[in-house]
């Protein structure tokens, strides 16, 4: 065992490719000096020259850089225990090439205009750089050999550990392995930091993590194998862990030498959906002049069919809801038809310079159908993520519990469930990657998913061993280590998937799923089905906990302020109040069902707390989306269902959302509503003009005015069937938010009014505040907007004109009052400062600072169309004699 195995390198010293930052940094000074010596500009500048360096100085710089490298090389050669002969030969070669460069450079500096001498210097410089590079690569190979020697030492101890015969030897060998792992990890980390290739750095980092994770597992499994050598599953676990350690050692060995490791498996078809849709959108825009059916039709149809195949795989997945499956199929058929229509229009326009209107319409329709398909795919993927990552550890806990009780007959069934659970998590993680553009996040997701796939059979083997020997402490310890490892990896995967998933999409889908689960709870309670009640309640708790966790993590990425405080207030209310109340009511209901005393239970209380948990989730989502742009809100609203799940507590929630009903109003009512909205927008533009000049970082009045304006705009959008508000309850909640903002503005403005010494100004400000209070109350009353169905002459006619008109009018009046309040607050603030500054001003309630102008580039950027503009001939320049200029000079007039 003492004899060391000779280390063989797979690095070619003649290959001059620089792989490390260290070699690159050492070469840089010499490259600069040599380049300065031999470089000659092809087009000399017409500006005045500075004094150039003498040739002797340039030569001395090259020699100094070379001798510095030679000194370092000689020290390395003296200390090296390997490659001594190669290093010595390389040093001699560098000296020889350095002398050759010196001779040719002296000849060149004597006659710098003679081309053959210049070419000789260039050749000598290249030869010197090649020799120095070879020397540095040899020095780098010594570092690699040192690392490989530690890999070999770890390998020998690792082989000894696999074959130990008793626990005493096991403990000694494992302690030795731990020390060697520490040394190996240190050298591997240094090599990882020095490598230029990002892929090789990632490979070494992954291998180091694998060694640290699997070494303790190997010790535990070996200990269990010594006690229970007859358990086949323990031997299988040991073989798997040994294989993982061996693979990690191979990766470190290959990556440190710059050798490519095993090729990554090809991406699944679904993983290319996002990029394939992007490519299709780019390829459908063609020039009719150059279009030929033989070229474009087969290629576009082939690309579309590949996309549809990937979408079909997603639609057929077990986690995809029936509704989304049908919609994906419908969108696939629609986009297929849109492509055929587009191709037909291209053929009709072939040879024409400009596109016809029908062709432009077909293009727009194709783009719309592409977006619709992408939207349905996003819905389905978010559904998968929301469902699959709900209870990530439950199948493992069930498997371990069965193993602890020694139920060998049931263990295979639970193992199959656990394996299916792992496969689903990996599948959903890959699906989440398919529509994401976060490359780093996708890489982390795939690494974490691969770890889970590798870990799954090991955990099943450990559970089988525990079921065979349920009283063995060594086997229990092994199972516990695997459990912790699984939990760590599942946590990493969950966080990684959350990072590449839009929080807005996740919250929209989670809100819909919680509403489904709430309805299931109520049905189960009324059907006296305890199992389904417990299952649905558990899903609600899990989804609510996931929402709280993800939103809390999202808020950590923002600076603390009013926005984060508002969001976290709702999250804390959910976790500290609503969920405990819900759990209490569920336990009461389950106890009543178990005792068959349901007639004593007040189910209305259960319905109320169920609705409360849904409303709180909705409030969290609304507060998160407070800072979103209108475009982002419109995109998220597309994710919401166009129908509402029927509530089992009221018959009135059946059918479409209140917002959707607004789009079905008669055209005459729509025109009148549009007139009211136009008047509202005029007032909104006044408010925008009033508040956009002020910096809102230290002015809460401006912040509140902006907030009220945004919410009122959402309410008016609701009356047109648009925007983020879906139901009348959302509009009522929005009116409540406006009322709260108005109350906060009232407090601030009254403080300003109390400090204002001008009685007329103070009186006007207080009057506008009373208007805000009045119109806020009026808006709350008018917020019960709903489309009523009337039966006229046997025809069903929807109408909502009165309530909509009242709502918009109240919003317009309130916005007018806000405009006047902002104006008068500023005027009152200026009077406070002007009058009281001689005696020392009071601390201002808010700071009225003008907003800094938007940054503009110092240099005007050229537009693409300007760079390709036609070049025109300039006017001829007329030379004027200096004497003529002097004769025309009159001087400055003195008055």
From Swiss-Prot:
* Organism of provenance: Homo sapiens
The UniProt keywords, alphabetically, are: Cardiomyopathy, Cell adhesion, Cell junction, Coiled coil, Cytoplasm, Cytoskeleton, Disease variant, Phosphoprotein
| Keyword Repressor among UniProt keywords | no
The similarity annotation says: Belongs to the vinculin/alpha-catenin family.
- Report the protein name in the record: Catenin alpha-3
What this chain does, per the entry, is described as: May be involved in formation of stretch-resistant cell-cell adhesion complexes.
In the record, Phosphothreonine modifications are located at: 649
GO cellular component terms given for this protein = adherens junction; cytoplasm; cytoskeleton; desmosome; fascia adherens; lamellipodium
Cite the record's note on assembly: Interacts with CTNNB1. Interacts with PKP2.
| Compartment(s) of residence | Cytoplasm, Cytoskeleton; Cell junction, Desmosome
Please tell me where this protein is predominantly located: cytoplasm
